Amino acid sequence: MNLGALVSETRNPATMGLDEMSTLEMVSCFNQEDRKVPEAIEKVLPAIAQAVDLAAAALKAGGRLIYLGAGTSGRLGVLDASECPPTFGVPHGMVIGLIAGGPGALLKAVEGAEDDAALGEADLVALDLTATDMVVGLAASGRTPYVIGALRYARQLGCPTAAISCNPDSPIAHEVQVAISPVVGPEALTGSTRLKSGTAQKLVLNMLSTGAMVKLGKVYENLMVDVKATNVKLVDRACRIVVEATGAERSQAEAALTQTGFEVKPAILMILAGIDAQEAQQRLQQHDGYLRAALTR
């Protein structure tokens, strides 16, 4: 493939004079380019919605959501996956991020890893991939062999698949059920896809994981009601969430949380339904953890 022909690799005529600009002119130029990212995302929202539905269905069926990429793309997948347990209270391993070259590649590039299609497949084999898992490949260029190899293996197993690329009609788009291709144009710094392309991928991942978790009942209204109160900040957030959801005084929210082991959902249910902690837990179990359903019983 002629990489120079990729949109993400071409020169940006608006930034030719970067090295001659004042600092303010330079950062203003970056900012103008970044404005193109949400516009590109808007054009692919239907595809993102499809991917959210696939991810939610896979997770409901007991599968996993697996992100996979090289370099910046891989790091972004690992970042999004690592935020899911504390934010949504899901177990580690439910959302997984893989990067070409393994964990060490998060800090230091592993030469040649992204060019090895067999490595992508091997990394999924090591996870004991099954057809219930969803695999999402990330590659700004849309042609990374590591990602293509993984997606082909996932497709052979019958996994739901999606790909996130910033080039139109890319090779990985032809390997998946859902292709998400926000075309953000040439980078301000030629070929540096950690810039607009990376931002676009992060925005898509935000929507994908958050949207799936909303559909799994991890959100009530716009509150993260399955947050794990693992530090002082999150204990305070848990209390504020209960107050926001119920209108109760902080002291009442703290009392309810103490009885539920600082689990937010049953604490909210206790206050709004006027029941004790045990009944709140039982009612949530009856409704598969969906707080709104438990409240409207």
UniProtKB/Swiss-Prot annotation:
Listed InterPro entries: Etherase_MurQ (IPR005488), Glucokinase_regulatory_CS (IPR005486), MURQ/GCKR (IPR040190), SIS_dom (IPR001347), SIS_dom_sf (IPR046348)
Alphabetical list of PROSITE patterns matching this protein: GCKR, SIS
Q: Which SUPFAM superfamilies match?
A: SIS domain (SSF53697)
Entry superkingdom:
Bacteria
Q: Please list the residue ranges annotated as the SIS domain.
A: 55-218
Q: Which GO terms describe its biological process?
A: 1,6-anhydro-N-acetyl-beta-muramic acid catabolic process; amino sugar catabolic process; N-acetylmuramic acid catabolic process; peptidoglycan turnover
Induction comment: Induced by MurNAc 6-phosphate that releases the repressor MurR from the DNA. Repressed by MurR in the absence of MurNAc 6-phosphate.
Q: What is its EC number?
A: 4.2.1.126
Which terms in the Gene Ontology molecular function aspect does this entry carry?
A: carbohydrate derivative binding; carbon-oxygen lyase activity; ether hydrolase activity
Q: State the UniProt keywords alphabetically.
A: Carbohydrate metabolism, Lyase
Its pathway, per UniProt, is: Amino-sugar metabolism; 1,6-anhydro-N-acetylmuramate degradation; Amino-sugar metabolism; N-acetylmuramate degradation; Cell wall biogenesis; peptidoglycan recycling
* Pfam families in the record: GKRP-like_C, GKRP_SIS_N
Signal peptide residues are none
Q: What class of enzyme is it?
A: lyase
Catalysed reaction(s)? N-acetyl-D-muramate 6-phosphate + H2O = N-acetyl-D-glucosamine 6-phosphate + (R)-lactate
- Role noted for this protein: Specifically catalyzes the cleavage of the D-lactyl ether substituent of MurNAc 6-phosphate, producing GlcNAc 6-phosphate and D-lactate. Together with AnmK, is also required for the utilization of anhydro-N-acetylmuramic acid (anhMurNAc) either imported from the medium or derived from its own cell wall murein, and thus plays a role in cell wall recycling.
Record's subunit section: Homodimer.
Q: Which family does it belong to?
A: Belongs to the GCKR-like family. MurNAc-6-P etherase subfamily.
Give any extra note attached to this record.
A lyase-type mechanism (elimination/hydration) is suggested for the cleavage of the lactyl ether bond of MurNAc 6-phosphate, with the formation of an alpha,beta-unsaturated aldehyde intermediate with (E)-stereochemistry, followed by the syn addition of water to give product.
State the name under which the record lists this protein.
Answer: N-acetylmuramic acid 6-phosphate etherase
Q: What does the organism's lineage look like at the top?
A: Bacteria, Pseudomonadati, Pseudomonadota, Gammaproteobacteria, Enterobacterales
Gene designation: murQ
